[in-house]
Each structure stands twice: as structure tokens, then as C-alpha cells.
A protein has these predicted regions:
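Conserved lysine of the Walker
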Residues: 12
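Hydrophobic positions on the alpha1 helix immediately C-terminal to the Walker A/P-loop
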Residues: 15, 19
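A basic- and aromatic-enriched beta-loop-alpha substructure that forms the phosphate/nucleotide-
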Residues: 59-102
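NTP-dependent small-molecule kinase module
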Residues: 140-231
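A glycine- and Lys/Arg-enriched "phosphate-lid" helix/loop adjacent to the NTP-binding pocket
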Residues: 84-165
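Hydrophobic anchor at the beta1->P-loop junction of P-loop NTPases
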Residues: 4
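Conserved substrate/cofactor phosphate-moiety recognition/catalytic segment
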Residues: 21-67, 83-87
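P-loop (Walker A) phosphate-binding loop of NTP-binding proteins
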Residues: 7
Length: 231
């Protein structure tokens, strides 16, 4: 199972689709939706966790099915969902209890996935990294989004915090194989570039060092909820 994570606008969906094409495997893609930009609903009140539940129910089902498939690709992880909720709570856009409830909701459903089957196949977390200014430049390429951020300064603050927290989260991630990719070094629309990433994945798969367990996954998500006062 290949999980493509990373900072905003780093090319996660494009790479996920093309990795699946390269490996002739299945890709589970999250379409652009409200939860990708959680603070955009500030004017409407608090952020609701319920919007994500349908997505997560489907995603949990997909994870269970992909446990024995080393090249099934996901373009978003449940870890990042917990992290986004925590960042939003830290900025005051929803209650801390709501973020905790969200974690508990995911935890409950993860406990029903037969993770013992995961030992039959390798798993890897890719992290697509970008410097903050490059990330913002890419986000600003969508005129409506740029206008919205320019007129709602809290969004810029959110992206700053998210960029730092995503990087910190990946540095502390040690629950499966992982690989950092500098998104500026690759064109994920170019299959030759995609092949370079794929070959790195294959090399790591040849010498796996981790077994995925329920406790490890839950511990990683719990780390997403930990405040870091330096950020």
C-alpha cells in the first residue's frame, strides 16, 4: 500500500494517479472537497466533523481491502485528517474536544480493520515536500483561492501552521517505510519522472523494516494531536 501525503499543492493526486498507472494498480483518489480547505467555512460557524465521516467510512473500507496490495495507491491518509482537525482547533476554528472526538471516531473504525493481514504486503508513506513560498505560489495559481486568502488573513496563518506541522509530523513518523520527495525536483505529469519515484519505492520494498500494527497507527494519529509550542 502506497500512501501519498505532503504539504498542500505538492502534487499528491497527480503522483498517486500516475504511480497507479505505472504499477498497473488501483488508485483511491480524494476529490477536491470542503475538508481540503477546512477554514473556508469560518463565516458559516464551526467546522463540522460529520462532513468527513462518509469519506472516512469509505476510506476505512478501502484500507482494509488494500492491506495485502503493496502497490495500491492512496492520495491522502487518515493521519492528515486528524492533523488538519487539530490545527483548526489550535487556531480556534473548532473546539479541542471536537478534534479529540474525531480521533476517537477514527480509532474505533481502525480497530475493525484486520491489520494482521498487512504483514503480507509492504507499505510506504511518501511525503511530498515544498518550501512554504513555493506552496503558497502554487495555491495562488487558482485566482479565486488567492483572492479568498488575501481577504481572509486567518487562512494564510492556517497554511503557515499546516506547512510546519506537516513537516514535523513526517519527521516524527516511524510506523512504516517512508520516503521524502522534493516536489520541486519532479514533474509528476511526466511518466519518466514518476518512474524515478517508483524505482525508489521498489528499492525500499526489497528490504522492509516495519510491520504495521493497530497500536502503531493509533500512536501516530495521537502524535498529530500533540501541541508543539515551537510552532
Amino acid at each position: 500500500m502506497i500512501i501519498v501525503s505532503g504539504v498542500y499543492s505538492s502534487g499528491k493526486t497527480t503522483l498517486a494517479k500516475n504511480l497507479a498507472k505505472y504499477f498497473h494498480s488501483k488508485a483511491h483518489i480524494v476529490e477536491s472537497r470542503q475538508t481540503d480547505n477546512p477554514l473556508y467555512d469560518k463565516a458559516k460557524g464551526t467546522i463540522s466533523c460529520s462532513y468527513d465521516e462518509d469519506f472516512l467510512m469509505e476510506r476505512m473500507k478501502q484500507i482494509g481491502e488494500a492491506m495485502t496490495e503493496p502497490y495500491t495507491v492512496f492520495d491522502r491518509s487518515v493521519y492528515e485528517d486528524v492533523l488538519r482537525m487539530k490545527i483548526s482547533a489550535d487556531l480556534g476554528f473548532l473546539d479541542q474536544e471536537e478534534a479529540e472526538d474525531y480521533f476517537a471516531w477514527i480509532n474505533k473504525r481502525l480497530s475493525k480493520i484486520p491489520l494482521d493481514r498487512s504483514n503480507e504486503a509492504s507499505q510506504i508513506l511518501l511525503f511530498l515536500d515544498l518550501p512554504f513560498h513555493d506552496m503558497i505560489d502554487r495555491i495562488y495559481q487558482v485566482p479565486k483561492v488567492k483572492e479568498y486568502i488575501m481577504t481572509h488573513p486567518f487562512l494564510y496563518e492556517y497554511y503557515q501552521k499546516a506547512h510546519l506541522r506537516y513537516r514535523e509530523w513526517f519527521e516524527n513518523y516511524h510506523y512504516s517505510e517512508k520516503l521524502r520527495i522534493n516536489a520541486l525536483d519532479y514533474d509528476f505529469n511526466n511518466m519518466d519522472n514518476v518512474a524515478k519515484v517508483a524505482k525508489q519505492i521498489e528499492e525500499i520494498y526489497q528490504n522492509p523494516k516495519f510491520e504495521i500494527t493497530y497500536d502503531a497507527i493509533v500512536d501516530n494519529m495521537r502524535q498529530s494531536l500533540v501541541n508543539n509550542n515551537s510552532i
